[in-house]
């Protein structure tokens, strides 16, 4: 079933590999709407350990590769986030899309800038190892959390509020947009969906796909909208779905002409 038609869809912070990733719901959005451009705005992966990807996560990646086929006439862009840093070369081959740190395009006479937003997060930049430790602790909590992952999602929301990231990222993004003479700027990273106008620049945050409220952005001639996923959350036990090498993973690597998945199972020790 095809829903509304848009020029651009923007999704961020899907965190493939995380127990709370709503990859199936994100895939549902991609398959429901019609669009000319798809911007994956960073942190598509939770980390660089492919062994944590479930069958649903591989299906999401496989669909991205299908969208990148020129016959689809969809421009697919991957903007690098702090969690998927280091995957640019592999992802450009695996799913067939270009990877950027900053992406600029024009639509309806306005310059648009997309960047993940971690560039304005001083804590992430200055405390890399503390951040890695926090990721590991959060992973352990996810493993023992209930089926609905209520505790994990609550901690994720509180984490972004403790760091006061939302306002900090917005201010930094607006400054960058002004320097680049862009009228609109889009970020992720904070997991908090937001829209505001500051000094003549429209700022939008696409939210995340790890919370009970999953959000994404749409752009058409009427403007930019924050959309909330209307379907239900797919509750399941991801740890029971992990296989040594999922069939979807093997097919994806083969279609990309890359060596077997085993060589990439963990890109960060």
Segments and roles (model prediction):
Residues 77-181:
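Conserved catalytic scaffold of divalent metal-dependent phosphoesterases
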Residues 107-108, 197-269:
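Binuclear metal-dependent phosphoesterase catalytic core
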Residues 162-221:
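Extended, basic/helix-rich recognition subdomains
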Residues 2-7, 16-107:
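Core catalytic region of metal-dependent phosphoesterases/phosphodiesterases
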Residues 1-20, 130-163, 240, 245-246, ...:
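Mobile, glycine- and charge-enriched loop segments
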Residues 7-15, 111-118, 202-207:
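Active-site-proximal beta-strand elements of phosphoester/diester hydrolases
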Residues 13, 38, 43, 64, ...:
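Divalent metal-coordination and catalytic microenvironments
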Residues 16-19, 45-49, 79-89, 119-123, ...:
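Active-site environment of divalent metal-dependent phosphoester hydrolases
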């Amino acid at each position: 079933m095809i829903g509304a038609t848009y020029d651009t869809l923007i999704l961020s912070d899907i965190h493939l590999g995380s127990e709370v990733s709503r990859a199936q719901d994100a895939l549902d959005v991609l398959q429901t709407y019609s669009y000319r451009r798809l911007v994956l705005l960073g942190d598509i992966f939770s980390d660089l350990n492919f062994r944590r990807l479930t069958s649903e996560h591989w299906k999401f990646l496989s669909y991205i590769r299908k969208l990148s086929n020129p016959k689809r006439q969809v421009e697919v862009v991957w903007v690098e986030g702090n969690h998927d840093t280091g995957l640019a070369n592999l992802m450009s081959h695996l799913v067939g899309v270009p990877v950027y740190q900053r992406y600029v395009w024009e639509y309806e006479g306005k310059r648009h800038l997309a960047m993940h937003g971690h560039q304005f997060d001083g804590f992430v930049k200055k405390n890399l190892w503390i951040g890695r430790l926090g990721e590991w602790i959060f992973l352990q909590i996810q493993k023992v959390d209930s089926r609905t992952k209520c505790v994990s999602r609550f901690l994720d929301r509180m984490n972004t509020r403790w760091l006061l990231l939302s306002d900090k990222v917005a201010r930094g993004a607006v400054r960058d947009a002004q320097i680049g003479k862009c009228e609109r700027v889009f970020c992720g990273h904070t997991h908090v969906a937001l829209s505001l106008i500051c000094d003549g620049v429209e700022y939008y945050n696409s939210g995340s796909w790890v919370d009970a409220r999953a959000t994404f952005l749409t752009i058409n001639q009427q403007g930019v909208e924050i959309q909330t996923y209307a379907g239900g959350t797919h509750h399941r036990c991801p740890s029971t779905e992990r296989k040594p090498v999922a069939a979807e993973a093997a097919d994806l690597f083969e279609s990309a002409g890359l060596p077997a998945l085993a060589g990439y199972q963990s890109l960060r020790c």
